[in-house]
Swiss-Prot record:
Positions with a binding annotation for ATP: H149, E332, V367, L368, S369, K370, R371
UniProt short sequence motif 'HIGH' region, positions renumbered to this chain: 144-153
Listed GO biological process terms: glutamyl-tRNA aminoacylation
EC number(s) per entry: 6.1.1.17
Record protein name field: Probable glutamate--tRNA ligase, cytoplasmic
UniProt: L-glutamate binding residues: R139, F140, P141, D173, Y311, D312, F313, A314, C315, R329
Length: 631
C-alpha cells in the first residue's frame, strides 16, 4: 500500500497519545492495520487511488462499516487511513458524497480527534528546526519539464534559507530526456529570481552521467545489481507481493554483459535493478529500478547515452559527489531515505548528506500535478503556464498574489513535518492586508444595463459642471491624485438603481447627497433616474452610499474573474474534469484615470473588490476580495 508519510506519522501520534500504542516504523499504516487485525482489503489502500479505485474501496468500506463493530483503536486506524488521502478529504466535503456510513463514521471520529489534530499540527509550525554544523551546502533539484508551482516554492525557499552562510546548488534533474526541455531551465531560473533567490551555482545531473554509469557497474560487480527483463506489470505485482524476479540470481558476468549491451542500445527490454531486499516491509527497498532505456536525444549529452539512471539512484550519489551536506525533501518520500543511504554505503561514498524532510504544501482545490497542468496547457484549456487558474508561481502572481506575501506565508509554515490541507482564504486574506495600502481607489460600474442619472439643482436646472482633484487613496497620499468631473450626466449600476426608492436621499461617494425625484422603468429595467443635488444633506444619515462615473469622462475596460481549474466530477478524464466556468469576463465603465494604470499594479474598485492590472485596461479580480455591497 502507498501511504502519505506525514499523515501516517499523525496516526502514530494519535494512537500513542490516545491508546498508548507504540509508534511504528515504515510502512506505518500497514503495520497498524496488521496489528489491529483489520480485513485484508485495507492493505489495498493507496493515497494515489484513481477516482474509480477510490470509489471501489469506499464501496467495500461502507458495507464493512455497516456490518462490523469497532473498538476505538481500530476506528482510529481506519480514520487515519481516510484522513491521509487528500482525494478522499475533498470528496467527502462534496454534498453529493453518497457513502452514508462512511460520512457518519468519519465526521464522528473527526470531531472526537479534533484536539489531537490541533495539538499535532501546532508542534513545530513556523519553526525552522534543522540542526546543521559548519558551512551548509544545499541543493534544489527541479526537473526542467515545466514551470515552478506552489509545491516547489517551499523547497526552494527553505534550501536558500539554510544556505545563507554556505552554498546553494540549483541542480537540474535531467535524468529523463523524454520530459525535459531546455526552455524550462530558463523559466525556472527566472522564477527563482522572482522569489529573490540569486546566490547559487547551477549544476546538472547529466554532469555525472559517466560516474553514475561506473557506479552502476560497481554495484553489479559487488553482486548488488542485476539486469531484469520482467515486464512492468509483472514486476509491479512481484514487488507488491515480495516475490523475487526470475533474474535476481543471474551471475555477475552475465549481468555485466547485458548491461554493456543495454548501454549500446541493445537489450531494450532490460532494466538494471538494485539487489536490496525483495521482502522488506519498506517497499522502496524491494529491488528498485536504477537504470532504464530511453529512446530520446538528451538536451546536453545528445546521443551519447542510450540508458539513463533513475532519480532514486542518481540523487544520493550526485548529492555526495557535489558536496551536499543537507538534503531537504518532502516527507512523502521518507520511505526512500533508507534506500538513499543504502546506495551511499554500498558504494563507499565518504560524503553522506544529512536528510531533513518537511511537509509539502497542500492547498484546497488546487492541482499540483505537473502532468495535469501540462495537459491543460498543451490542449489549450488554459492560456499557458502563467494562466491564473494554474498553481504555478507565475499563475498565482498573475492572479494578484503579492510575492512578499507568498514568501512570508510559506516561511511562516517553517520546516514542519506535519501535513495539512491549507485553505487559500488564509493566504489571500494576508495578501489583501498587504496590498491594501498600495492600491489606488477607483470608481466603475458594469456596462450592461447601466443607468443614466440626470442631476438637477433645487430649481430644476442642470447643475454646473465642476472639476476636482482628489487623492487616489486618502490613507496613502503617495499614490497621487486623480481628477473627477461632477456634472449633470452620470451613470450608476442597474443593481444600485434598483435599491433606490422615490424621494429617498442617498449619498454619491466623493460627492455628496442626492434625492431621487423620478425613476423611469421600461420592461422591468431602469433606464433613467432624475436626481436633485442636496449638498447640505448629512452623509452620516443616509442608508445607501453609491459609486458613480461621469457619462462623458469614462473608459471601457475588461474585468476577469477566475475560479478553480477543475470541477467536482468524480472522473479521471481530465477534459471532463475541467471547470468550464472557471473564467468569466465582463465589460465595465470606469473613470478615465484607469487608463494610466500599468500592468502588475494593484487597485481597488470601490465597493467591488481588489484587482491587479493584467494588461492595459484589463483587470483580474483578486480572490477573496469581492466585497459585500455596502448600503
Amino acid at each position: 500500500m502507498l501511504e502519505n508519510i506525514s499523515k501516517s506519522e499523525f496516526v502514530n501520534f494519535l494512537l500513542e497519545k490516545k491508546h498508548n500504542i507504540e509508534p511504528k516504523t515504515l510502512p506505518i499504516l500497514e503495520q497498524h492495520i496488521r496489528e489491529q487485525k483489520l480485513d485484508d482489503f485495507f492493505l489495498d489502500f493507496s493515497i494515489d487511488f484513481t477516482d474509480e479505485e477510490l470509489n471501489n474501496f469506499l464501496s467495500k468500506l461502507d458495507y464493512w462499516l455497516k456490518n462490523t463493530k469497532l473498538n476505538s483503536s481500530k476506528a482510529d486506524v481506519i480514520f487515519g487511513l481516510l484522513y491521509s488521502c487528500n482525494k478522499f478529504i475533498k470528496l467527502i466535503k462534496n454534498p453529493t458524497f453518497s457513502f452514508v456510513e462512511i460520512k457518519q463514521f468519519y465526521n464522528d471520529i473527526l470531531n472526537t480527534n479534533k484536539n489531537y489534530i490541533i495539538e499535532y499540527n501546532k508542534k513545530d509550525k513556523g519553526k525552522i528546526n534543522i540542526a546543521v554544523e559548519g558551512n551548509v551546502v544545499t541543493r534544489f533539484p527541479p526537473e526542467p519539464s515545466g514551470f515552478l508551482h506552489i509545491g516547489h516554492i517551499k523547497a526552494a525557499l527553505l534550501n536558500d534559507l539554510m544556505a545563507k552562510n554556505g552554498k546553494l546548488l540549483i541542480r537540474f534533474d535531467d535524468t529523463n530526456p523524454i520530459k525535459e526541455e531546455k526552455m524550462y531551465e530558463n523559466v525556472i531560473i527566472e522564477d527563482l529570481h522572482t522569489l529573490g533567490i540569486k546566490n547559487y551555482t547551477i549544476v546538472r545531473s547529466s554532469d555525472h552521467f559517466d560516474s553514475l554509469y561506473n557506479y552502476a557497474i560497481q554495484l553489479i560487480q559487488l553482486g548488488l545489481a542485476y539486469c531484469d527483463n520482467t515486464d512492468q506489470l509483472q514486476m509491479r505485482e512481484e514487488r507488491t507481493k515480495g516475490i523475487p524476479s526470475k533474474n535476481r540470481n543471474t551471475d555477475i558476468e552475465t549481468n555485466l554483459s547485458i548491461f554493456s549491451k543495454m548501454s549500446s542500445g541493445n537489450c531494450l527490454d532490460y532494466c538494471l535493478r538494485a539487489k536490496i531486499d525483495y521482502t522488506n516491509l519498506n517497499k522502496a527497498l524491494r529491488d528498485p529500478v536504477i537504470y532504464r532505456h530511453i529512446e530520446k536525444e538528451h538536451n546536453i549529452t545528445k546521443n551519447k547515452y542510450k540508458i539513463y539512471p533513475t532519480y532514486d539512484f542518481a540523487c544520493p550519489i550526485i548529492d555526495s559527489l557535489d558536496g551536499v551536506t543537507l538534503a531537504l525533501r518532502t516527507n512523502e518520500y521518507r520511505d526512500r531515505n533508507e534506500q538513499y543511504y543504502w546506495f551511499l554505503e554500498k558504494l563507499n561514498l565518504p560524503n553522506k548528506p544529512k536528510i531533513y524532510d518537511f511537509s509539502r504544501l497542500n492547498f484546497e482545490n488546487t492541482v499540483l500535478s505537473k502532468r495535469q497542468m501540462k495537459f491543460y496547457v498543451d490542449n489549450h484549456f488554459v492560456s499557458g503556464w502563467d494562466d491564473p487558474r494554474l498553481s504555478t508561481l507565475r499563475g498565482i502572481l498573475r492572479l494578484g498574489m503579492d510575492i512578499d506575501t507568498l514568501k512570508e506565508y510559506i516561511i511562516n509554515q517553517g520546516s514542519s513535518q506535519k501535513s495539512s490541507v491549507i485553505s487559500w482564504d488564509k493566504v489571500w486574506s494576508l495578501n489583501k492586508k498587504n496590498i491594501d495600502h498600495k492600491s489606488a481607489r477607483y470608481s466603475a460600474i458594469p456596462k450592461l444595463y447601466c443607468v443614466e442619472c440626470l442631476i438637477l439643482d433645487k430649481n430644476n436646472n442642470e447643475i454646473i459642471t465642476k472639476t476636482e482633484d482628489i487623492p487616489k487613496f486618502k490613507k496613502n497620499l503617495s499614490l497621487g491624485n486623480k481628477t473627477i468631473i461632477k456634472s449633470s450626466h452620470i451613470l450608476i449600476s442597474q443593481e444600485d438603481a434598483n435599491i433606490l426608492n422615490n424621494n429617498e436621499e442617498f449619498t454619491l461617494m466623493n460627492w455628496g447627497n442626492m434625492k431621487v425625484k423620478e425613476k423611469q422603468i421600461v420592461n422591468g429595467i431602469i433606464i433613467k433616474i432624475i436626481l436633485e443635488e442636496n449638498l447640505a444633506g448629512d452623509v452620516k444619515t443616509t442608508k445607501n452610499k453609491l459609486t458613480w462615473v461621469n457619462k462623458e469622462n469614462i473608459i471601457e475596460f475588461k474585468i476577469l474573474e477566475y475560479d478553480t481549474l477543475q470541477n467536482d466530477k468524480n472522473t479521471d478524464n481530465l477534459a471532463e474534469k475541467f471547470n468550464t466556468n472557471s473564467k468569466k469576463e465582463e465589460i465595465w465603465l470606469g473613470e478615465k484615470a484607469l487608463i494610466s494604470v500599468s500592468p502588475k499594479t494593484y487597485i481597488q474598485i470601490e465597493r467591488i473588490g481588489f484587482f491587479i492590472c493584467d494588461k492595459p485596461l484589463e483587470f483580474i479580480l483578486i480572490p477573496y476580495t469581492k466585497q459585500k455591497r455596502m448600503r
